[in-house]
Amino acid sequence: MSSSVPYDPYVPPEESNSGANPNSQNKTAALRQEIDDTVGIMRDNINKVAERGERLTSIEDKADNLAISAQGFKRGANRVRKQMWWKDLKMRMCLFLVVIILLVVIIVPIVVHFS
């Protein structure tokens, strides 16, 4: 066994006769290729999970900002609703006063004329 290669119990030891079993070498090379492919896929998955975490943090921040904006919008909408209610009330009071004044202007001369 060569001292430059670390011991791996799953890899059979290399025989001194390199051409003795080419089938075994092909299988070993294929297994190593599959392992390398799997390691690459796992690294990609880990990177994607990290990116997903960053995006989730960004989305969470945006959701918080949206909730704050929604509260401000709700307060503004309530303020406008109250302002419009007061404006409508003032308009109704003005119309009521105009109707009362018109009735007084019409009824008082009639009552004075017939009395």
UniProtKB/Swiss-Prot annotation:
It comes from the Eukaryota. Residues 17-28 have a biased composition (Polar residues). GO terms for biological process: ascospore-type prospore assembly; endocytosis; exocytosis; Golgi to endosome transport; Golgi to plasma membrane transport; Golgi vesicle fusion to target membrane; intracellular protein transport; retrograde transport, endosome to Golgi. Residues 27-87 form the v-SNARE coiled-coil homology domain. There is a cross-link at K62 (Glycyl lysine isopeptide (Lys-Gly) (interchain with G-Cter in ubiquitin)). The keyword Transmembrane helix applies. Residues 1-93 are cytoplasmic. SNC1 and SNC2 are vesicle-targeting proteins essential for normal secretory traffic between the Golgi and the plasma membrane. They may also be involved in vesicle fusion. Belongs to the synaptobrevin family. This is Synaptobrevin homolog 2. The gene is SNC2.
